Amino acid sequence: LKEMGIEVDDAPVEEKLPFKVEMPKELTTREAQEVLDTLIEKGYLDADYQPSKLTGWQRGVLAYEIGLYLGFRNIWVVMATLWKSNPGTLRAYYSKSFNEDKAIEYSKEIKMLIR
């Protein structure tokens, strides 16, 4: 981003939050921070890295796409830790997305943003 003339805050993610969030180590990389910041900018996450007005299945798809892109070994645990959620619930939300007509388009939308 710096190469494109966009100002980048180099402070660690944890220092930018107004409250203490348990930030999984998988999300402390520069690449992960850029993904999270993009999702905040586009309104998918709030300033505290929490889902912003998303349905359950949208949270599941978002968690899956973030984890897949960043190569997490355990997507559900990492994202549930950040979002103060239960890994099993988050995974169930993702499974529920298979019943949603809009899920494929939503998944494509997320992929376009984070890649």
Model-derived segments and spans:
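Flexible coil/loop and intrinsically disordered linker positions at secondary-structure junctions
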Residues: 1-115
